[in-house]
Amino acid sequence: MNSHSEALFEINQRLSSHIRTMSNFPVFDPQKITNDVEANIKRMTSILKSKRLTREDEDLMKMINDCSKVLHEMLLERIMLQQDSIQFFTEKEASDSPFSNSADTIDEDDDKKIKSRRLTKKQLLVLEGWFQKHKNHPYSQKDQTNLLIKSTKLSKSQVQNWISNRRRKEKNTKVSPELAALLLTG
């Protein structure tokens, strides 16, 4: 392995490590990942300027590109989930406030008038927030179920069915073949 190949292999390993970290741990240090990726970009830029790439180097560059795409998508998804959670808790705090606007209750009444089989975004945020908080043991106790019923305005059976379906969805989540290949190479 030439020096470029060794450096590219190391970059690929580091990106794969970040992907595994994000896949396995709900909490990670985004600043650490950002700093590492920026350092890797600088290293790759200098390697590309040398213009002495072997076939092995080109293959490693393709793998790094694939890892970068996966890492990018995972980061975007995490950011979206985080923003949804922040928005949910901000809205919840505002609605719990004694100074909350009466327009909020009008919106909720409008939600009831629409005969839709799907849950509203607010209901999904509440339920998903509860599920993420209780992911280690996603079985609601009676008081938690009652709290979810009050905050979502759903029936007991709807709440219980949603939690049951969400547990099943979590259990059946499969890793895509592309991601599995990347995780196995690391």
Swiss-Prot record:
DNA-binding residues: 112-174
Family matches, as InterPro entries: HD, Homeodomain-like_sf, KN_HD
BP terms from Gene Ontology: cell differentiation; negative regulation of conjugation with cellular fusion; negative regulation of phenotypic switching; negative regulation of transcription by RNA polymerase II; phenotypic switching
Induction description: Induced by HBR1 in response to hemoglobin and growth signals.
This protein's UniProt keywords: DNA-binding, Homeobox, Nucleus, Repressor, Transcription, Transcription regulation
Note: The C.albicans mating-type-like (MTL) locus contains, in addition to the genes for the regulatory proteins (MTLA1, MTLA2, MTLALPHA1 and MTLALPHA2), a and alpha idiomorphs of a phosphatidylinositol kinase (PIKA and PIKALPHA), a poly(A) polymerase (PAPA and PAPALPHA) and an oxysterol binding protein-like protein (OBPA and OBPALPHA). MTLALPHA2 is not represented in the genomic sequence of strain SC5314 because that haploid assembly includes the mating type a allele of this locus. Most C.albicans strains are heterozygous at the MTL locus and do not readily undergo white-opaque switching and mating, but mating occurs in hemi- or homozygous strains. Mating takes place in opaque cells, produces tetraploid progeny and seems to occur rarely, if at all, in nature. Conservation of mating capacity is rather thought to be due to the simultaneously regulated white-opaque switch, which seems to play an important role in host commensalism.
Annotated family: Belongs to the TALE/M-ATYP homeobox family.
Protein name in the entry: Mating-type-like protein ALPHA2
Single GO cellular component term: nucleus
